[in-house]
Amino acid sequence: MTRIIGLDPGMSKTGWAIIDMDERSNIEFLGSGTISTGNKLGMGERLHVIFEQLKKVISLYSPSEAAIEKIFVNKNPKSSLTLGYARGIVILVLEITELTMNEYDTNYVKKSITGNGHADKDQVIFMVKQIIKNLNIKCHHAADALAVAICHVYTKSSYFVR
C-alpha cells in the first residue's frame, strides 16, 4: 500500500488530499482539506501557517510520496511570485519530512483526469467524483490536490502516457 499526498499550493489556500494506492492501483480516498491563511496576516505569518499546518497533515496521515502541481506563470507577476513563496514552503516541508516529491504540470494533471489538458475546474471536479465514488468535496483547492494525487497514481501505474 502506498499513501500519497496531493498538493495544490497557494498563499491564501493550499489544498491537500490523501489517498492510498494498493498493488493493483486501486485508489482509496482518506481525506482532504484546505490550509487557509487569510489576508490579514503578514507574508511571513502566512507562510508559517502553511508550514505548520502541512507538517500536521503529514504527521497525521504519514504519506510516503507527494505529488504537487508545478508553478505556472500568471499574467500578474506579483501573483506568480506570491504563489512561488507558498510553493517553496510546501517543498521545504516535503524535504524536511523526507517525502519523495513528484511534480506535474497543470495541463498534464487535467489531461490525465479528464482527457483534456485544458479542462476547466468543473470538469476536473466532475471526473474526480467519477473516480472516487461518494466523494463530498466542496473546495476546489482540495479537489485540485486530489486530482494531482490521482494523476500521480495513473502515472506510476503507466495508465497514462505523457
Swiss-Prot record:
Enzyme Commission numbers on file: 3.1.21.10
Cofactor(s) annotated in UniProt: Mg(2+)
Manner of cofactor binding, per the entry note: Binds 2 Mg(2+) ion per subunit.
SUPFAM superfamilies: Ribonuclease H-like
Uppermost EC category: hydrolase
Binding site for Mg(2+) 1: 8, 141
Top-level taxon of the source organism: Bacteria
Binding site for Mg(2+) 2: 69
Pfam families: RuvC
Active site (UniProt): 8, 69, 141
An annotated GO cellular component: Holliday junction resolvase complex
Main location class: cytoplasm
Keywords assigned: Cytoplasm, DNA damage, DNA recombination, DNA repair, DNA-binding, Endonuclease, Hydrolase, Magnesium, Metal-binding, Nuclease
Catalyses which reaction(s): Endonucleolytic cleavage at a junction such as a reciprocal single-stranded crossover between two homologous DNA duplexes (Holliday junction)
Example GO BP: DNA recombination
Subcellular locations according to the entry: Cytoplasm
Molecular function terms from GO: crossover junction DNA endonuclease activity; DNA binding; magnesium ion binding
Subunit comment: Homodimer which binds Holliday junction (HJ) DNA. The HJ becomes 2-fold symmetrical on binding to RuvC with unstacked arms; it has a different conformation from HJ DNA in complex with RuvA. In the full resolvosome a probable DNA-RuvA(4)-RuvB(12)-RuvC(2) complex forms which resolves the HJ.
Record PANTHER family: CROSSOVER JUNCTION ENDODEOXYRIBONUCLEASE RUVC (PTHR30194:SF3)
Family: Belongs to the RuvC family.
Cited function: The RuvA-RuvB-RuvC complex processes Holliday junction (HJ) DNA during genetic recombination and DNA repair. Endonuclease that resolves HJ intermediates. Cleaves cruciform DNA by making single-stranded nicks across the HJ at symmetrical positions within the homologous arms, yielding a 5'-phosphate and a 3'-hydroxyl group; requires a central core of homology in the junction. The consensus cleavage sequence is 5'-(A/T)TT(C/G)-3'. Cleavage occurs on the 3'-side of the TT dinucleotide at the point of strand exchange.
Protein name: Crossover junction endodeoxyribonuclease RuvC
Organism of provenance: Wolbachia sp. subsp. Brugia malayi (strain TRS)
Lineage: Bacteria, Pseudomonadati, Pseudomonadota, Alphaproteobacteria, Rickettsiales
